[in-house]
């Protein structure tokens, strides 16, 4: 039987369904998973959609994803390889009445990762286009309830137009920094008294380069935070001007830099430290600025 195409009004439960499925996916991908995102129409509040949860994962190694095909099948996924897009791994769940789709790319594949995030973020912030897209999809679903090819072809022109517009306005710098930080974040047991990698950080310099670092934890408080490690890498490479900073905990959440690190940056850039942006909430893209630390 062909897939039955239905387009329904936005459902707040879609976000919860994404979160539940993301936990299962991260458990299977384990340390190979760098980042995971809710994408597609169900990720856009207020947008009517087919009730299918689209999920994108960025990984370090696609071959390890292939090795996990059996594990995905155990939670109901059909593993379809690239499925028409080079460098992707595509999985779907639910058969003809599909419920979830996963699109997996390596972290270096910014073209594919970026276009998905750009389209999503644009739709989240542009109501006129969001409403127009919803109308197009509802009309097509009524006209072609069992013809997915006609449904997709019917909205292709609009999607490509919006994707081009979205990419022209998209600043994916925070996303690139997040991926760079997560890509080096893994626990390293260096000795019985020293471990590293629980927290990672990325900084963007005034020259547009990204430097990363991981925390070093010791038994006697002689370690180094991830932010200062990233700054050390920047200075080693002959730069000293910071524009943005993101620190990430072991659960993938953005965290503010510690007081000592903030004070260090005010000394590094005494006349310009207040212009350094720090990411406070990566999922919702909320950021702030460095303020002088007072103990």
Pin down the residues of each PLM region.
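Conserved catalytic core of two-metal-ion nucleotidyltransferases
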Residues: 77-110
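Helical scaffold of the NTase/Pol beta-like nucleotidyltransferase catalytic core
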Residues: 1-37
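Compact, glycine-rich, soluble single-domain proteins
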Residues: 214-228
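Active-site nucleotide-donor binding segment shared across nucleotidyl transfer reactions
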Residues: 24-66
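Short beta-strand scaffold segments in enzyme catalytic cores
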Residues: 195-205
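Short amphipathic alpha-helices in soluble, non-transmembrane regions
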Residues: 67-75
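C-terminal binding/interaction regions
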Residues: 173-191, 239-295
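Catalytic cores of NTP-dependent nucleotidyl/adenyl transfer enzymes across multiple folds
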Residues: 104, 111-171
């Amino acid at each position: 039987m062909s897939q039955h195409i239905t387009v329904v009004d936005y459902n707040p439960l879609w976000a919860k369904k994404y979160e539940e499925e993301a936990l299962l996916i991260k458990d299977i991908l384990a340390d190979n998973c760098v980042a995971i995102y809710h994408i597609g129409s169900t990720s856009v509040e207020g947008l009517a959609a087919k009730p299918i949860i689209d999920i994108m994962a960025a990984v370090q190694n696609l071959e390890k994803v292939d090795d996990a095909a059996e594990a995905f099948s155990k939670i109901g996924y059909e593993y379809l390889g690239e499925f028409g897009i080079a460098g992707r791994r595509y999985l779907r769940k639910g058969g003809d009445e599909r419920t979830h789709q996963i699109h997996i790319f390596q972290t270096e594949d910014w073209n594919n990762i970026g276009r998905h995030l750009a389209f999503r973020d644009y739709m989240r912030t542009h109501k006129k286009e969001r409403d127009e897209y919803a109308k197009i999809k509802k009309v097509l679903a009524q006209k072609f309830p069992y013809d997915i090819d006609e449904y997709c072809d019917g909205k292709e022109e609009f999607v490509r137009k919006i994707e081009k517009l979205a990419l022209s306005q998209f600043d994916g710098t925070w996303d690139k920094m997040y991926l760079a930080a997560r890509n080096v974040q893994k626990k390293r047991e260096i000795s019985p008294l020293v471990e590293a990698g629980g927290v990672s950080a990325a900084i963007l310099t005034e020259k547009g380069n990204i430097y990363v670092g991981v925390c070093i934890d010791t038994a006697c408080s002689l370690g180094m935070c991830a932010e200062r490690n990233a700054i050390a890498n920047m200075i080693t490479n002959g730069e000293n001007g910071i524009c943005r900073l993101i620190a990430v905990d072991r659960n993938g959440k953005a965290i503010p830099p510690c007081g000592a690190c903030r004070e260090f940056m005010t000394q590094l850039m005494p006349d310009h430290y207040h212009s350094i942006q720090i990411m406070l909430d990566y999922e919702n893209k909320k950021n702030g600025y460095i303020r002088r630390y007072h103990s």
